[in-house]
Amino acid sequence: MPGIVELPTLEELKVDEVKISSAVLKAAAHHYGAQCDKPNKEFMLCRWEEKDPRRCLEEGKLVNKCALDFFRQIKRHCAEPFTEYWTCIDYTGQQLFRHCRKQQAKFDECVLDKLGWVRPDLGELSKVTKVKTDRPLPENPYHSRPRPDPSPEIEGDLQPATHGSRFYFWTK
């Protein structure tokens, strides 16, 4: 029925939250973007194609799981340099990277040595990429209405207007 909205149950919505501040997320953003690229792009593709967030709950859970695993690995292997780095970002006035290059270098070195992750080059994560997915295409990906016939047949005889044209003052 078109007027009834089916909402997901609370069990379907239950996930562990990623409880971090903006400075922590900003400090880890480059490595997070490289490590969780596929789940994030799968989720965004699902959201764009489906136009309904309820249909993308599984992809959203995978994004959340990837983020939690990422921050657990950072905490396990590089907690001290990462804490120094995000604390520096947090205490600079506008959360700018340029004031914290020494801490960033220590963090990047730790991540490279212990996890084997290379910091992506500037602009690498913003390149347009094709996403290979196993999800089937939606039936109507643009959610467009059916188009009317371009030239419908006119029903009945058309009579001229009884009181003349709307643009009468233009014709005299």
Curated annotation (Swiss-Prot):
It is found in: Mitochondrion inner membrane; Mitochondrion intermembrane space; Mitochondrion. May contain intrachain disulfide bonds, as evidenced by its electrophoretic mobility under reducing vs non-reducing conditions. Disulfide bonds join C36-C66, C46-C56, C78-C110, C88-C100. One of its GO terms (biological process) is proton motive force-driven mitochondrial ATP synthesis. A motif (Cx9C motif 3) lies at residues 78-88. Contains four C-X9-C motifs that are predicted to form a helix-coil-helix structure, permitting the formation of intramolecular disulfide bonds. This is NADH dehydrogenase [ubiquinone] 1 alpha subcomplex subunit 8. It comes from Homo sapiens.
